[in-house]
Amino acid sequence: SLRYKDWFEKAAHDLRGAEILLEHDGGNDLVAFHCQQAMEKMLKGWLLKTTGELLDGHSLVFLCRKATAAGAPLKGNLRDCAYVNQFYIETRYPSDSYMPVSEEEARDCMDAARKLMELLA
């Protein structure tokens, strides 16, 4: 969609899904994944609103850098984006080297997503 509000709504929906999963022991890997999705959609929506451009890709680091360059107050959030970004692929597919996501990591992802969404709202 080229309507930034659609991206913001989907981001909020993903964050709410992550909150429900965390509250009801629905899987820390799914919490981390939905936090990544919320952050990605919020960044894409903000960039669409600000620049008129809908960017491709899933890298939170790339999107955070683009948003910062476009004036978003995210200089201190690049580390959070890099942290949550690591869970995007790792949590989606089975792997021989799979490392489970701890509750602490899931909560850290949740904190990062909430912080980013507050800054860009």
Please report, for each region that a protein language model flagged, where it lies by residue.
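Terminal alpha-helical segments
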Residues: 1-121
